[in-house]
Structure formats: C-alpha cells, structure tokens
From Swiss-Prot:
One cellular component (GO) term of this entry: cytosol
Cystine crosslinks: none
Protein name (record): Argininosuccinate lyase
Matches recorded under PROSITE patterns: FUMARATE_LYASES (PS00163)
Gene Ontology molecular function: any one: argininosuccinate lyase activity
Subcellular location: Cytoplasm
Pfam families xrefs: ASL_C2 (PF14698), Lyase_1 (PF00206)
Catalysis: reaction(s): 2-(N(omega)-L-arginino)succinate = fumarate + L-arginine
Gene name in the database record: argH
Organism expressing this protein natively: Streptococcus agalactiae serotype III (strain NEM316)
Length: 462
C-alpha cells in the first residue's frame, strides 16, 4: 500500500520530506492563477459533458462545485495548502471536498501541463488588456498636457547641455509616441497570447474525443495551438511580454529621470504634487520625487525578470520540465510593477505644476539660439560650415565677456556680412526659433498642433 497521498502518488512508496515539499511547492505565488484555473476548468468540464466523455449529470455536479469555489474565492474564503503543491491540485482538492469523488473526473483528457499553460495565457491576456487601458490614459494625459503647453518654450538638450529651444508640448509628444509604440508592442504580444493550449494534455494530445475548438470559444481565445508539444513547452509569449515591459519601463525611467531633474532646485521647471513626493527625516525643507525615483529604480527589476526567464528557457528540451515553475513569479512581478508605474506616471503628470516662466527664462540666458544665427548667415549666402565657424567664435567671445548673441550690436554683425539686418534680433528670440522649425515632425508650434491632432485621432480610434 502506498504511503504517498498526493493526487499523483500511486507510483510512490514514500512521501516527500517536508522541507523538500516546501522547496517544490508553488502555491505561495501561483494562487494568483486561481480565478483563471477555475475558469479554464469550467470550459473543460463543459466540453467533457457535451462530447459525452463524462455524463451530463457528472458535468453538472462539477460545474456546480466550481461555481461554489468561484464564489468562495471572490469572498476571500478559500484556503490553500502547501501540501497540495500548486493551485491546480489545491482547486481539485477543494472541489473534491465540495462534491466528492466525481471531482476526479474533471482531470479527464487534461494534464497539469496544458492546464498551467492555459491559466497563464488567460492571466496574461487579461493583464495585457488592463495595461493597454492604463497606457491609453497615460497617452491621453500627455496629449492634454502637450496641448496646454504648445507655446511653452524650454531648452532642448543634447549631452544634457542646452542645444536648441523647443516647445514643451513637443517634448511631451515625443513620449506620447514612445508610449504609443509600447501599446502597439503589447497589441502584437496579444496575438501570441490569445491562443489556447487546453487539450494538448501532457505533450502528445489525448485519446479522448475532445473538442479543442469548443474550449477555445468558451475561453474566448482566438484559436487553439496547432501543435501539442509547442502548446505546453514554450513560454515565448511571456518572454515577449517581459521584453515589451522592459522597453516600456525604460521609457518610463527616462521620463522619470527628466522629471527628477526638472523639479530640482537647479532647474525648477516643474513642481510635483505633494501626493507624489516625500520628505526627509532630518532635513525639514526637503520635497523628494520618490515616486519618480522608484519607477526609475524598479526598471532594473523588470529587466532582471526578463533575463531570468530567458536563462531558464535557454537549455530546456521539449516538452515540460519543472524548471518552468520559474516562469510565474517574474511575470506576476512585472505585471504588477509596470501597471502601477504607468498609473503613477499618468497621475503625476496630471497633478504637477509647470513653471512656464522659468522654462522660458532659461532659454534667454544661454546660447541655444546659436543654430538660428548660423542658419541666418547661411540664408544670406555664407556657406553653412563657414557660418558655423563664425558663430562658434562669437559664442566664445560672448562667453568671455558675459554677454549673449542677442547682445551683439548690429554694427558688429554687419562687419561679418552687410546683408545682416535688424531682423536678426527677432530671429534670435527663443519663441521665433521654435516657430521657424516648421519641418514635418519639428518643434514649430504649427507642427506640434499637427502632432496633437493626429494623436487625438489615434486615441479616438482606440
């Protein structure tokens, strides 16, 4: 007589040591799959009944039992046990306690291999949809903010040095476009997630006359996997998500880095709401951008989850291996981390104050109008390379005497070229510099309006 009381214990003469059992158990984290596991089981037993693999009466009893468990789960009344290893065994054990041995018929024509794969496809499909909705909110917030700041002028940077004046709205629309591509990547990810592994069984399919198309429809998947080995053994849809999540977090992190700089004493371009700031335990004056810093910091954690799963998968032979238990925690963690990061970013932008005057003033005491002068000279017939050299020397001279290009007398400019006129001073203003950059996709005010108009159409279409 066997001493192993596991649902799979028939072949064993002894039980696992408790500490070994704890090492192998996954219920501490895969219980997040509980609602998806019960949903998949409901579809599976419906199919078993309709194909007469089990009787309609048995299918009805099992469905009634699953409904009881679903209600208890929603009410927070289900208790899971480590002795049942994982969420699948826990649900089956709880179902058996509710309806008796007939619960054992639920696992007909099914393995935990296709069961867990189905659960994860359902989970990730659900979370991808939620994440895209949150990105839609973030992108809408960016467009609204950009529309309010089309005419707000700020320094544009390269190498963290003042480069050329730009519209703050233009800067915000750059991030809108990045997050739009992030959304598109998640949409493509959905294509590879919206597949049903259910019915693939352990690896080779089943001898029972199952209807995989029926369970696919019941679970609202696009189509079933066409190869049972592929269905149970790959996790590329999760790796694809973790890769997309890493790119998305990189974009959030870059934006947070700028927000952290902008709200510093040295910049003062923005003021964050108290809701997204914290203080210091010793320095009373501090208002720290902790939420932006945490998003920046948690980006590395999402990267780590990607590399962890890639490493797990790199040498696995087909089909299922226990290594695949390591596919879940990183996925759960990344879903939760990215989701809250998107929400915080959107709300942080909605509640921050933009100090327009400081942004504008910072473009009046720098040399970010140097390109305007070079372009002006080139328009008067001076070769651009020569104009570049002339302006570079003027910048050097101004730097030495504490003046700026707009301070140089017209008489001095006309010594460079008699074609230079008084309009040079209007051209050297930051607002004019921005307005004149009206090439497609440029920072010119009219171009920013076009970008916003296009974005509004994209958002409406979604």
């Amino acid at each position: 007589m066997t001493k192993n009381h596991k649902l799979w214990g028939g072949r064993f003469e002894s039980s696992l040591e408790k500490w070994v059992e704890e090492f192998g158990a996954s219920i501490s984290f895969d219980q997040k799959l509980a609602p998806y596991d019960m949903k998949a089981s409901m579809a599976h037993v419906t199919m078993l009944g309709k194909t007469d693999i089990i009787s309609q009466e048995e299918a009805g009893l099992i469905k009634d039992g699953l409904k009881i468990l679903q209600d208890k789960y929603r009410a927070g009344q289900l208790t899971f046990s480590i002795s049942n290893e994982d969420i699948h065994m826990n649900i089956e054990s709880l179902l058996t306690a509710e309806i008796g041995e007939v619960a054992g018929k639920l696992h007909t024509a099914r393995s935990r291999n296709d069961q867990v794969a189905t659960d994860m496809h359902l989970y990730l499909k659900d979370k991808l949809q939620e994440m895209m909705k949150k990105l839609l909110h973030l992108r809408t917030t960016l467009v609204n903010l950009a529309e309010n700041h089309i005419y707000t002028v700020m320094p544009g940077y390269t190498h963290l040095q003042h480069a050329q004046p730009i519209s703050f709205g233009h800067h915000l629309m750059a991030y809108y476009n990045m997050f739009t591509r992030d959304t598109e990547r998640l949409e493509f990810n959905m294509k590879h997630t919206d597949l049903s592994p259910l019915g693939a069984a352990a690896l080779a399919g089943t001898t029972f006359p199952i209807d995989r198309h029926m369970t696919t429809r019941l679970l609202d998947f696009e189509k079933p996997y066409s190869n049972s080995l592929d269905a149970v053994s790959d996790r590329d849809f999760i790796i694809e998500f973790l890769s997309n999540a890493s790119i998305l977090m990189m974009h959030l992190s870059r934006f947070c880095e700028e927000i952290i700089n902008w709200c510093s004493y040295e910049y003062q371009f923005i003021t964050l709401s108290d809701t997204f700031s914290t203080g210091s335990s010793i320095m009373p004056q501090k208002k720290n951008p902790d939420m932006a810093e945490l998003i920046r910091g948690k980006t590395g954690r999402v990267y780590g989850n990607l590399f962890s799963l890639l490493t797990v998968m790199k040498s696995l032979p087909l089909a299922y291996n226990k290594d695949l238990q390591e596919d879940k925690e990183g996925m759960f963690d990344s879903v939760e981390t990215v989701s809250i990061a998107i929400e915080i970013m959107a709300n942080m932008l909605e509640t921050m104050t933009v100090n327009e005057h400081i942004m504008m003033t910072s473009t009046e005491t720098d040399f970010s109008n140097a390109t305007e002068l070079a372009d002006y000279l080139a328009s008067k017939g001076i070769p651009f390379r020569k104009a570049h050299e002339i302006v570079g020397k003027l910048v050097l001279e101004c730097s030495k005497n504490g003046s700026y290009l707009q301070d140089i007398p017209l008489k001095y400019y006309q010594e460079i070229s008699e074609l230079i006129e008084n309009d040079i001073y209007e051209i050297l203003t930051a607002k004019t510099a921005v307005k004149r950059r009206n090439s497609l996709g440029g920072t010119g005010f009219d171009q920013v309006k076009e970008q916003i108009l296009l974005a509004r159409k994209e958002l409406k279409a979604e």
